[in-house]
């Protein structure tokens, strides 16, 4: 009798499985870190849109003393126009030159931009003070040199010496006026340099004085939309039930999240119902896209939707810094993904009622509609595949 040995299937060593799991986890955490860190690491403080009031000569003088490309200046006729531009979200702040220099900020638009403009005001004040001191020193030097002449001569203190003093004072005044519009000659008795006033046109609320709450609110809203999409995809079947679940989630989730953000923490301001509607639209749009991708391509669609929302849309949403600071063109792209759209709408509803948010609302509706279309297409695709298999 012969004995035939059955070959045993080869099994990989256990340590290889452990190594593979560790490598996959390492790659995953590195991708997550890169996704969230690179917008900040590559950000550049430049091209901040700011309104400016003053003559071209004054604007040129101030511009020459600033780092190149720091600000994108938009000349306006007067202070009122600058304030209107801030309240409509056309600019982040304003610089008023002339006899009463002033820096206009909006901490509600961006605490980072507000701090930067405050620094610009500090530098302007330093420049004005230096010009005044230089003018006074020049006047004193000319007075001292004129005081050494013989009495009654050409350099007598009451004649040419006084003229020299007046000329020096006029020169100092001209310098101060070019920088910020001083009213008095720096060398004149009792002359004081103009003070650069800083005004927060649209301040943050007392409940969120540093804007940190509004900045981090985008993450739970993004995760909320993603979690809703995943749960609906896994727990609900059928196109009608999918769409009904998305609609109900948008309504209930919007009311609940807005209630927490506004009623509990005071992060959101103004009308609660408007904030709830915007919040619900945002999370419904995210959930809709994830459900649609899952219906169309299966379980990988959930991963695609999560990556698009969490690891692409959220880091470039510009909730923590102006979009102009994010590496182009990603700052602008982020404003048309759901996290950026939701953040902009909620910020404007809370603090900038004069801002036009129609474009952002329609864009969110567009994302919601895209998810619905993908859901319907996926349903018909699955039905066709089932009929083919049965036939």
Question: Which residues are covered by each model-predicted region?
Answer:
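Terminal targeting segments of Actinobacterial cell-envelope proteins
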Residues: 1-16, 192-206, 331-334, 343-344, ...
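Hydrophobic alpha-helical transmembrane segments of multi-pass membrane transport/permease proteins
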Residues: 7-45, 219-227, 310-314
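Generic detector of multi-pass transmembrane helix bundles and their immediately adjacent loops
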Residues: 292-391
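Hydrophobic core of alpha-helical transmembrane segments in multi-pass integral membrane proteins
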Residues: 30, 253-258, 368-377
């Amino acid at each position: 009798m012969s004995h035939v040995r059955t070959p045993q299937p080869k099994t990989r060593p256990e340590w290889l499985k452990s190594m593979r799991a560790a490598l996959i986890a390492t790659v995953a955490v590195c991708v997550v870190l890169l996704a969230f860190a690179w917008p900040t690491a590559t950000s550049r403080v430049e091209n901040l849109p700011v309104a400016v009031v003053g003559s071209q000569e004054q604007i040129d003088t101030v511009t020459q003393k600033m780092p190149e490309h720091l600000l994108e200046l938009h000349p306006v006729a007067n202070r009122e126009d600058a304030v209107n531009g801030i309240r409509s979200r056309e600019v982040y702040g304003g610089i008023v030159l002339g006899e009463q220099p002033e820096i206009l900020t909006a901490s509600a638009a961006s605490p980072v931009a507000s701090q930067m403009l405050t620094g610009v005001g500090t530098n302007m004040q330093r420049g004005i003070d230096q010009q005044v001191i230089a003018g006074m020193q020049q006047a004193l030097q000319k007075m001292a040199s004129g005081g050494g002449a013989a009495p009654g001569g050409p350099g007598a203190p009451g004649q040419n010496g006084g003229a020299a003093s007046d000329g020096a004072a006029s020169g100092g005044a001209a310098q101060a006026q070019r920088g910020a519009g001083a009213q008095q000659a720096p060398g004149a008795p009792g002359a004081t340099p103009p003070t650069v006033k800083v005004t927060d046109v649209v301040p943050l609320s007392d409940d969120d004085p540093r804007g940190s709450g509004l900045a981090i609110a985008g993450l739970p809203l993004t995760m909320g939309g993603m979690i809703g999409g995943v749960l609906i995809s896994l727990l609900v079947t059928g196109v009608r039930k999918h769409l009904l679940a998305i609609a109900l989630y948008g309504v209930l989730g919007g009311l609940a999240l807005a209630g927490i953000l506004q009623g509990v923490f005071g992060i959101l301001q103004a009308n609660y119902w408007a904030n709830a509607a915007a919040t619900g639209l945002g999370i419904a749009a995210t959930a809709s896209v994830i459900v649609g991708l899952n219906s169309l391509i299966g379980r990988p669609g959930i991963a695609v939707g999560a990556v698009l929302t969490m690891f692409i849309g959220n880091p470039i949403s510009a909730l923590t810094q102006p979009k102009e600071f994010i590496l182009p063109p990603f700052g602008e792209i982020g404003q048309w993904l759901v996290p950026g759209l939701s953040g902009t709408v909620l910020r404007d509803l809370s603090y900038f009622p004069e801002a036009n948010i129609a474009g952002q609302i329609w864009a969110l509706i567009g994302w919601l509609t895209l998810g619905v279309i993908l859901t319907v297409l996926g349903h018909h695709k699955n039905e066709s595949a089932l009929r083919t298999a049965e036939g």
